[in-house]
C-alpha cells in the first residue's frame, strides 16, 4: 500500500475558524494586567504568522512582549518544554530571549481560552548572513545551543520526521487543496520527492536527533552589538543538528559552501558537527517546503 494512503487526514482548524477573534485590545490588556502589570494602553502588533504577538506598553517601565499561543496547536506540556529549553540555555549564558517568570517561577499563563507568555523586549535586526564573520559567530552560538540540546531529549515535543513533514503534508494538500486537474501530477511529483528524501536519510547511519530551535532563519535572530539574540523557539523539535544550520546559508553553491565552512568551524569549537549530515540539507529543505504548504492550508480559515 502506498504510504500516502496509510496516513489519516490531519486535523484542521475547522472547529476554530478564527481562534484569535476574541483578542480585543481590552482582552489583551486584562491578560497582561492579570499578572500584576499596569498597562498604559499602548498596543503594537508584531509579525507572527502562527501565534499572536504584541508589544504592550507598561506604565513607567519598558514595554513587554505578549505572546498568545494558537489554541490546539501545542499542548500545555509541549509549551512548557519549549520554555524549559530556553531557561536551560539562559543558565548557560546563551543569548536567548526566555519567557518572563513570576515570583513563583511560572512562565506560562492562561487567560480566557488562551495560553500566553510574556517576554522582555530586545532590540535588534536580522543578521547579514552573507558576512562570514557573522556566520562564524552564529556557528559558535549554535554549537553551544546544541551542546545543551543534546543533554536530554524532549519528552512531549515531536521530531521532524518524513512522516509528519512529508507524507502527512502531502496527504492534506492532495485531498483538499489541489485542483482535480493537477492532483495526479502533484501526487506523482511528491511521491518521487519523498522517495528521494527517504533514500538520503537511509544513507545516514546512526543519525542523532537533538533538541533544536527548529526554525533558525534570520527572522528569528536579533543582531545587535556584533552578537545575536535567538528568539521564538515555538517550533523547537527533535531534529538533526544540521536543521539549525542550513537556513543560515544563502546565495549560490560556492557562496553557501564558503558560508557553511565558517558556520561549522565556529560550531565545532563547542560541539562536534558530523559531516554525514550534510547530505540531509536538501531533504530537509524539501520537507520544510512540503510542511509549509500544509501549514498554510491548515491556516486557510
Regions found by a protein language model. Name each.
Residues 1-103, 225-227:
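Conserved NTP-binding catalytic cores of kinases and kinase-like/nucleotidyltransferase enzymes
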Residues 128-185, 209:
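A cross-family kinase active-site recognition segment
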Residues 241-272, 288-301:
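Active-site activation/catalytic loop segments of kinase-like enzymes and analogous catalytic loops
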